[in-house]
Amino acid sequence: MIINAKGPASFAEKYIVRSIWENKFPPGSILPAERELSELIGVTRTTLREVLQRLARDGWLKIQHGKPTRVNNFWETSGLNILETIADLNPEGFPVLVDQLLSARTNVSAIYFRGALRNSPDTAVEVLGQIHQLEDTAESFAEYDYLLHHTLAFSSGNPLYVLILNGFKGLYSRVGRYYFSSPEARQLALNFYKELEILAKAKNYIDVPALMRTYGINSGKMWLQLRDDMPSSIAQQDGNA
């Protein structure tokens, strides 16, 4: 098992998570005793204990006082916060993960975009007004796109959508910088922003779902043209597009 880590705690965490992912510690199984596991990984018991607590908070493990530590089925117990970890564990499946991420984001964003234009049209107009000073670079578009989604999610009347976005912020930011490296993708997005601004100024939230659906289809086609050339480094938390 080859693991790149910045320190003992990071190494221990990645070792345990990868062992769970590769079914060496399958769901429902009991982890080795603390002393045995610390010797196996090569870290102190204090470091291991801290790592186990962190993994339990993320849903990978179940820790109960006086009982052995049990491995959870993370698909049932974890949240969006492990997306980064899954991307790191399964780089070969990363393009499919991104497909699923973008599909989920498109479906959810149609709800909070409509809600924002209905409940806070002035806020929508204000944030959309920034497109007229937007630099034609991948970084600027990726940053603005996230800002737009974050602002409209918060203004939709249901701030829980913001927490959903926060769950895959790092992953989406890296993918976004790659996606918006395409001039065609930037132009497609800019056209969408302009049409959305028109709806916001007219306080027309009724037509938002149709606009979102059209943009979702077109941006999906654009993504399919770009995904096969996506650098594998994007899957890593410190990867650069």
UniProtKB/Swiss-Prot annotation:
Multifunctional regulator of fatty acid metabolism. Homodimer. One of its GO terms (cellular component) is cytoplasm. It is found in: Cytoplasm. The keyword Lipid metabolism applies. InterPro entries: FA-response_TF_FadR, FadR_C, TF_FadR/GntR_C, Tscrpt_reg_HTH_GntR, WH-like_DNA-bd_sf, WH_DNA-bd_sf. It comes from the Bacteria. Residues 34-53 bind DNA. This is Fatty acid metabolism regulator protein. The gene is fadR. It holds the Pfam family GntR. It comes from Shewanella sp. (strain ANA-3).
